From Swiss-Prot:
Main location: other
Catalytic activity: Na(+)(in) = Na(+)(out); Li(+)(in) = Li(+)(out); K(+)(in) = K(+)(out); Rb(+)(in) = Rb(+)(out)
Organism: Bos taurus (Bovine)
Gene that this polypeptide is encoded by: CLDN10
Organism lineage: Eukaryota, Metazoa, Chordata, Craniata, Vertebrata
Protein's name according to its UniProt entry: Claudin-10
Extracellular side: 22-80, 137-160
Cellular component, GO annotation: bicellular tight junction; cytoplasm; plasma membrane
Membrane topology category: Multi-pass membrane protein
Amino acid sequence: MASTASEIIAFMVSISGWVLVSSTLPTDYWKVSTIDGTVITTATYWANLWKTCVTDSTGVSNCKDFPSMLALDGYIQACRGLMIAAVSLGFFGSIFALIGMKCTKVGGSDKAKAKIACLAGIVFILSGLCSMTGCSLYANKITTEFFDPLFVEQKYELGAALFIGWAGASLCLIGGVIFCFSISDNNKAPRMGYTYNGATSVMSSRTKYHGREGDLKTPNPSKQFDKNAYV
């Protein structure tokens, strides 16, 4: 019962993390920078994995898509690949988890389902590592440029998408670890066994009682013979 509850918790945590990781791909604010005026913010610069934009004080945004993939910076290409891999691994991990959970009716025996659940945990861990690496790589580039005194271009700060990605990656890692430990709970489950004591004769208590009663009522022929001998 405890193993089933832990699998359900792991599934909910992992799916929540996968949804958060997936939501970072279309999110706009991976990095953001603002130009403040004397009274209001005059412009906001932001970018994600696909485009860079600027929004003026009236709320009008002008965006520019990134050029060809071969002309992109290496860290953006790496982040794209890692985040897409994280989303794909999370999708397959959710399928394996549904098959391997004890509360589902597919997957075969309990031993086979435990192995599938462990595989789902490994896949979710890989998904979390990919997402964590991609977000950390992007954040490292931002912080390096921000604290570089020789960098004269527009400096950015960490956007909301990075924190969402880190949170989703952490949930995927936690859920994957719980899935992996669920197989050890299945191995610790007690087995019902029966011991063989050999063939034994069975006699009911009623039969024994009647047998004893018959023995008590049976007269001794030797005693009757002795009495008749003296008549």
